[in-house]
Amino acid sequence: MIGCDIVACSRIESIYNRHNTLFLDKFLSKQEQAYIKNTNTIAGFWAIKEAASKALGVGISKECSFFDIIIFKDNKNAPHIKFSTKVMKEFDIKSASVSVAHDGGFAIAVVAIEKN
């Protein structure tokens, strides 16, 4: 299953400038927030979570909240995702991969999910 999302970095920057950490707290854990360097990172994380929920075919919903999708980085600073135990079981997920890029004022993410 594959999901994709694109977001204007300026849109995320505008929301962040108005709401600061209140905005971040709506979709990122404190651990995920620790990775943030700038608003482009926030936009990339938004796109990752949206793409992951689309790959599941449900979007952000009761079946999969923002906090059921967990972003972490490896020692080379590359992003990875995993899902909550609830989502892993409900959707029979074996593994997930993510790619994120920034260009021309946009952040785009693609998530591929392999089922058992």
UniProtKB/Swiss-Prot annotation:
This chain's source organism reads Campylobacter lari (strain RM2100 / D67 / ATCC BAA-1060)
Primary place of residence?
Answer: cytoplasm
Please provide one cellular component term from the Gene Ontology annotations of this protein.
Answer: cytoplasm
- Stretches assigned to coiled coil: none
Protein origin, superkingdom: Bacteria
Question: Under which EC number(s) is this enzyme classified?
Answer: 2.7.8.7
A Pfam family of this chain: ACPS
What is the protein's given name?
A: Holo-[acyl-carrier-protein] synthase
Q: Does the keyword Membrane apply?
A: no
Q: What class of enzyme is it?
A: transferase
- Where is it localised? Cytoplasm
Family classification: Belongs to the P-Pant transferase superfamily. AcpS family.
Q: Which gene encodes it?
A: acpS
Q: Name one GO biological process term.
A: fatty acid biosynthetic process
Give the keywords, sorted: Cytoplasm, Fatty acid biosynthesis, Fatty acid metabolism, Lipid biosynthesis, Lipid metabolism, Magnesium, Metal-binding, Transferase
Annotated Mg(2+) binding sites: D5, E50
User: What does the record give as cofactor?
Assistant: Mg(2+)
| The reaction(s) this protein catalyses | apo-[ACP] + CoA = holo-[ACP] + adenosine 3',5'-bisphosphate + H(+)
A GO MF annotation of the entry reads:
holo-[acyl-carrier-protein] synthase activity
Q: Function of this protein?
A: Transfers the 4'-phosphopantetheine moiety from coenzyme A to a Ser of acyl-carrier-protein.
